[in-house]
Amino acid sequence: MTETQPASASFNQPRYWLWWTAATIVGWIIGYAINNLIITVFNFTEEAVTQGDRPELIIASILALISMGLSVGLAQWLVLRREVPTSTLWVPATTLGFAVGIWFGLAFMGLGTGLAQWWVVRKTFSKGSWWPTISAIIWPLGYVAGGSVSGALIVPLGSQLLAGLVGIVVTGLIIGAITGAVLLWLLREQRAVGAA
């Protein structure tokens, strides 16, 4: 048995999944916009990164990592809090998990995020240990798929910024849709445990 139960008795699963997926997409779009602003402000060019002669790029990199995790975490929390009132630390956990995870490499982006998010909801979901596993697979997969779409669209769209935006939407869609399905499963399982 778990310490807390998901909140609402009336639960529209398809709507909740759509909200979760949309929130994840919006979070990625906001993070993308903030990251583009950071790139502009710090004149973050590939040449400057490879030469390593600008210490402020470290600050820019940290800000970029924090902003992406923060924007996705906040957008998801706005949906999650409706059903999981104990999720108050979701935003800082997602921010930290994403930043630390991706700092170690793209493959760890989902693991870091998933572990941090699981820590927040571990007492709510009896089968919540699936969350980091799914996140470890889906976050990098979504990111790579979005990056591939973005790369394929740069020439046809004639804009790296627009192609990147489409890629980010694909990233958010994949991550949001699959983690949303897992979240629904966890919520259903928890309701079944609570009803027993």
Regions found by a protein language model. Give the residues of each.
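Juxtamembrane/disordered regions of integral membrane proteins
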Residues: 2-196
